[in-house]
């Protein structure tokens, strides 16, 4: 049984048997993996608390046929401890881990940029760097942009005209009055500016005012369209 070492962020866990857990982790070098953490539900477990959601850990893993097994786990950053004490941050963290979990398959494909974006977002939540809602919404748009779904927001996707007044999720960006499709929704300049700031992580804009409801709805709809399934945690952050 071969061993490999990597660092990663725990996305979610599920119970297995009486004392074990299956953990889903986005790693730096091996993409998303699922591994068995044996005995972690026992009170005397060596590393149970290190393998909770939102924790960044250094792992030694034994490769298996269907599931790997965690042999060692050392904490790198305990984001979870800082996040769970703040409900708004906890909601945003759930949006973040649900998004990356649904975005990334388990093909062990290395995706360093996605990993860096993930730890950056969780670190910002833990440090209260910005409003949790803005961090969560910006993460969704930036993660999808890294996957190739960046909205075109400067000029009409049909004719290239400036001063667009509509946004079509299916068409991938903004549209002018003359060329907008039936699915396109009218968008005010202020909302378009916030949406663009979420895509590019422009915190000067995002720190100036709370994210508008219409913009949060755009993030939710954009995510559902391109992931082909809803990000359910976003519905809570928007309520």
From Swiss-Prot:
<protein>
    <recommendedName>
        <fullName>DNA repair protein RecO</fullName>
    </recommendedName>
</protein>
<dbReference type="InterPro" id="IPR012340">
    <property type="entry name" value="NA-bd_OB-fold"/>
</dbReference>
<comment type="function">
    <text>Involved in DNA repair and RecF pathway recombination.</text>
</comment>
<keyword id="KW-0233">DNA recombination</keyword>
<dbReference type="Pfam" id="PF02565">
    <property type="entry name" value="RecO_C"/>
</dbReference>
<keyword id="KW-0234">DNA repair</keyword>
<dbReference type="GO" id="GO:0043590">
    <property type="term" value="C:bacterial nucleoid"/>
</dbReference>
<dbReference type="InterPro" id="IPR022572">
    <property type="entry name" value="DNA_rep/recomb_RecO_N"/>
</dbReference>
<dbReference type="InterPro" id="IPR042242">
    <property type="entry name" value="RecO_C"/>
</dbReference>
<dbReference type="InterPro" id="IPR037278">
    <property type="entry name" value="ARFGAP/RecO"/>
</dbReference>
<dbReference type="InterPro" id="IPR003717">
    <property type="entry name" value="RecO"/>
</dbReference>
<dbReference type="Pfam" id="PF11967">
    <property type="entry name" value="RecO_N"/>
</dbReference>
<dbReference type="GO" id="GO:0006310">
    <property type="term" value="P:DNA recombination"/>
</dbReference>
<comment type="similarity">
    <text>Belongs to the RecO family.</text>
</comment>
<keyword id="KW-0227">DNA damage</keyword>
<dbReference type="GO" id="GO:0006302">
    <property type="term" value="P:double-strand break repair"/>
</dbReference>
């Amino acid at each position: 049984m071969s061993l490999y070492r990597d660092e990663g962020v725990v996305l979610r866990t599920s119970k297995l048997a009486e004392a074990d857990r299956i953990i889903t982790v986005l790693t730096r070098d091996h993409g998303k993996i699922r591994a068995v953490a044996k005995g972690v539900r026992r009170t005397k477990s060596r590393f149970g608390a290190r393998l909770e959601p939102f924790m960044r850990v250094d792992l030694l893993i034994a490769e298996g046929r269907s599931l790997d097994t965690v042999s060692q786990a050392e904490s790198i950053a305990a984001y979870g401890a800082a996040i769970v004490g703040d409900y708004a941050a906890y909601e945003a963290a759930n949006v973040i881990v649900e998004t990356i979990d649904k975005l990334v398959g388990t093909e062990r494909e290395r995706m360093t940029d996605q990993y860096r974006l993930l730890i950056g977002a969780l670190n910002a939540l833990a440090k209260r760097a910005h409003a949790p809602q803005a961090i969560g919404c910006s993460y969704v748009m930036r993660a999808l942009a890294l996957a190739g779904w960046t909205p075109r927001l400067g000029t009409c996707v049909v004719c290239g005209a400036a001063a667009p007044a509509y946004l079509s999720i299916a068409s991938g960006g903004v549209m002018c009055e003359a060329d907008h499709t039936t699915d396109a929704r009218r968008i005010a300049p202020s909302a378009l500016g916030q949406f663009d700031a979420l895509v590019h992580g422009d915190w000067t804009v995002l720190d100036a005012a709370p994210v508008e409801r219409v913009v949060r709805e755009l993030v939710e709809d954009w995510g559902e369209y391109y992931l082909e399934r809803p990000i359910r945690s976003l519905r809570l952050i928007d309520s």
